[in-house]
Design a protein with these regions (language model features):
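Short amphipathic alpha-helix that is part of the acyltransferase structural core
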Residues: 1-61, 68-75, 142-182, 216-221
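Intrinsically disordered, low-complexity, positively biased terminal segments
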Residues: 11, 151-388
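Conserved acetyl-CoA-binding loop-helix of GNAT-fold acetyltransferases
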Residues: 76-81, 86-100, 230-241
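Conserved GNAT acetyl-CoA-binding A-motif
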Residues: 95, 99-114, 245-256
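Conserved active-site alpha-helix within GNAT-family acetyltransferase domains
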Residues: 104-108, 114-132, 257-273
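Flexible glycine-/small-residue-enriched beta->alpha junction loops
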Residues: 127-143
Length: 388
């Protein structure tokens, strides 16, 4: 039986998760009931004939930015199954159930942090989020301009910090909007782990960039960094140079398309790209209507293959006039066909139409509509760094 866990079934939830994550049941219980998940999630469970929990995962609701708009998102966490019940298809059935739940709650997107990308592809998820990790020698930062002033930000500055963070993140597809609960949790974490939070201000005393960082030995590790423009980013980089007596290098986590190496004295620094999280579209029609389109185009059609969310498993006719996307559905032969995995990558902007065609992710039935297809799906910055 697949269902939403009751309070009575929580003990079975903790037992199953504790086994899979190698934690005690009490540790799992304390982590969930004292942390940000408490009262903010549903656990989807599979029960055996004795009504014992054999498989479980959580749906954690978030608001996220997509195309500059705030939409609902279902985060998947704690996927667990006891070994005696694996291979029976329970997790697949649970995902199907969860997509019905998300549809009822208007969660347009979903995402997760995979232990194996190939496993979660079976449920329609695909690689949509990557971060870039760079290590910069401290002396490479000496020639950047200083801000008019710098100020350490405290928890009482939380509203200033979060408003600026939202202002920057609304330009990106995927970041979580931190509500009061999540913001308090993050600030408490910074306080408890000796992170410092600083802002850079211009000559009008306006916040133009900010970051949270921690000194570890001779290295500064930056947890978050937000900046209005290139100048304000360089103001932060110079701030780190002021720490040169204690620091040999700075580690930054950046968007994968960030071009920071172009502004450094030498691009030969240590850097790497890490495939981070997977994303999935739960409601295709609603997601298409959210897109911001640069150029109008005539109607063309896309067939989506999605056997776990049958409302997506159809042909969508798409057109754009005056920057507004119009969508209708039918079962005619489509100009393009693809699975929900690759559609999810395309609509987030992790890949563009040309890449999808080149990599044979799309079946093309009408080559005359490729130009319009490329107008709909183009490259964008994606980001999902929230842990869940």
């Amino acid at each position: 039986m697949i269902k939403i866990a009751t309070e009575k079934e929580r003990a079975g939830v903790y037992k199953t998760m504790g086994y899979c994550f190698n934690w005690s049941e009490d540790a799992i219980k304390n982590n969930i009931e004292s942390g940000s998940f408490n009262k903010y999630e549903e656990f989807i469970v599979s029960l055996n004939d004795k009504e014992d929990v054999e498989s479980v995962f959580a749906i954690i609701p978030y608001d996220v930015y997509f195309e500059g708009k705030i939409v609902k998102f279902g985060g998947i966490g704690g996927v667990s199954s006891l070994p005696e019940n694996r291979g029976a298809g329970n997790i697949r059935k649970m995902f199907k159930f969860s997509f019905e739940y998300m549809k009822e709650h208007n969660m347009i997107f979903s995402g997760l942090g995979p232990f194996a990308f190939q496993y979660y592809r079976k449920f329609g998820y695909e690689w949509c989020f990557t971060w870039q990790l760079v290590n910069i020698p401290i002396n490479d930062l000496k020639d950047f301009p200083a801000a008019s002033s710098y100020r350490q930000l405290k928890k009482e500055d939380k509203e200033l910090f979060e408003n600026f963070r939202n202002h920057i993140n609304e330009r990106v597809n995927g970041p979580v909007v931190r509500d009061e609960r999540l913001a308090n949790e993050k600030w408490d974490y910074y306080r408890n782990t000796n992170h410092k939070v600083y802002g850079a201000f211009n000559d009008k005393n306006e916040l133009v960039s900010m970051m949270a960082f921690k000194q570890e030995g001779k290295e500064i590790k930056v947890a978050e960094m937000y900046f209005e423009d290139e100048l304000s980013r360089q103001n932060l980089l110079y701030f780190f140079y002021r720490e040169r007596s204690l620091t040999e290098k700075v580690e930054l986590v950046l968007h994968v398309d960030d071009e920071i190496r172009n502004i450094l004295p030498s691009p030969r620094i240590s850097y790497w790209h890490w495939p981070n999280k997977m994303g999935r579209v739960v409601l295709v029609e609603e997601a298409l209507k959210l897109l911001n389109i640069k150029n109008s185009f005539d109607n063309f059609s896309i067939k989506i293959n999605d056997d776990l969310a049958p409302w997506n498993n159809q042909t969508f006719n798409v057109s754009c006039v005056n920057d507004k996307v119009d969508v209708s559905c039918d079962n005619s032969l489509a100009d393009f066909e693809m699975d929900i995995n690759r559609f999810s990558q395309l609509i987030y902007g992790h890949i563009d139409a040309s890449q999808a065609i080149k990599l044979n992710f799309v079946k093309i039935n009408n080559k005359t509509r490729i130009r319009d297809f490329e107008k709909l799906f183009y490259k964008k910055t994606t980001m999902l760094w929230q842990e869940f």
